């Protein structure tokens, strides 16, 4: 009798435990498997049309051989819907869509997408994406894909942080001047950014790297994308010369060349900015000599020699009182002026007007 009562007490408990275990097993069966995440790389997305909008693209390697990209933008408008894509080539070159990254919600500034292939079905892994020749565009809206709110080079096109900036001085128009900055890419190529002040709205200004120094002049080696007069900006990928010779970041630093920015395609003879680059860059070391008047007491000036990276020099003769239209030859002679001597070196003539 006592045994039966004990069984009555334990039987409901046993059945209850079986039901709980059964429910627990059912829950485990319906839960999706968790995908682990491994290495990650973050790329910067710079502002384009709106200087307040910028962000990052975090690329994540998943354990199941898929890739997740998390886009995070700051200051996107509430309610905005911003399509994003990975494109082929660099941002400076432009290219077709490789991978669709979904929509960045303006309210959160975020978008997350996981994939294992390009839009055309070509498989891609995390490692392949780190070496990909591409860039990311985030657009204003599906109806305005032409307006970009953020952009950044990725993969082999990522910038290393190494850069070199050259000054571009004014030529025909004293209010136009600026800089040319070359930034190294992971693949050894370079992003060239020309930034000019004082360019006219609507102006289109061709630019080139020429052979030799500016004072010597020379043929065109490399063609930049034209400078937009409204923004004063030009961006160009630097990978090869016009003759298809390889030409990357390290080559820029050593080139025997100079940059010319022209007024327009129809007036290449008028220069708006110019600067020596590469081995012709000036080091900042200089020496100035006085040139006293001789036959005409109102004409006098200076001769300044500025050292170049390659050890050569830029000689600038500056005279006051020269007549408009005058052309005045100049030379370095042997010995002292009081002794006199033969010609050792010939300068380019002094332009009397300037």
Identify the residue ranges that each predicted region occupies:
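Bacterial N-terminal signal peptides that target proteins for export
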Residues: 2-11
């Amino acid at each position: 009798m006592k045994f039966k009562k004990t069984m009555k007490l334990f039987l409901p408990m046993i059945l209850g435990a079986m039901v709980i275990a059964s429910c627990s097993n059912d829950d485990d069966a319906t839960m999706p498997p968790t995908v682990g995440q491994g290495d990650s790389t973050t790329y910067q997305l710079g502002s384009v049309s709106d200087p307040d909008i910028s962000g990052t693209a975090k690329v994540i390697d998943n354990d199941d051989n898929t890739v997740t990209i998390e886009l995070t933008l700051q200051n996107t408008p509430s309610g905005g819907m911003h399509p994003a894509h990975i494109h082929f080539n660099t941002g400076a070159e432009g290219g077709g869509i490789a991978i669709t990254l979904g929509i960045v919600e303006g309210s959160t500034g975020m978008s997350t997408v996981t994939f294992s292939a390009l839009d055309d079905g070509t498989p891609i892994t995390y490692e392949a994406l780190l070496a990909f020749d591409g860039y990311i565009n985030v657009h204003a809206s599906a109806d305005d894909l032409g307006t970009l709110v953020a952009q950044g080079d990725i993969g082999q096109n990522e910038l290393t942080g190494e850069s070199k900036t050259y000054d571009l001085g004014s030529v025909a128009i004293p209010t136009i001047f600026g800089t040319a900055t070359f930034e190294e890419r992971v693949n050894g190529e370079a992003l060239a950014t020309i930034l000019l002040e004082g360019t006219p709205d609507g102006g289109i200004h061709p630019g080139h790297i020429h052979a030799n120094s500016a004072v010597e002049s020379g043929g065109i080696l490399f063609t930049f994308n034209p400078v937009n007069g409204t923004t004063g900006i030009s961006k160009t990928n630097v990978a090869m010369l016009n003759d298809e010779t390889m030409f990357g970041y390290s080559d820029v630093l050593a080139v025997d060349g100079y940059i010319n920015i022209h007024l327009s395609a129809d007036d290449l003879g008028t220069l708006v900015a110019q600067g020596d680059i590469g081995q012709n860059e000036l080091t900042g070391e200089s020496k100035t000599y006085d040139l006293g008047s001789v036959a005409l007491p109102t004409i006098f000036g200076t001769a300044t020699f500025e050292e170049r990276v390659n050890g050569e020099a830029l000689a600038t003769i500056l005279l006051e009182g020269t007549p408009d239209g005058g052309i005045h030859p100049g030379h370095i002679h042997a010995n002292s002026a009081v002794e006199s001597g033969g010609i050792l070196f010939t300068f380019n003539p002094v332009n009397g007007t300037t």
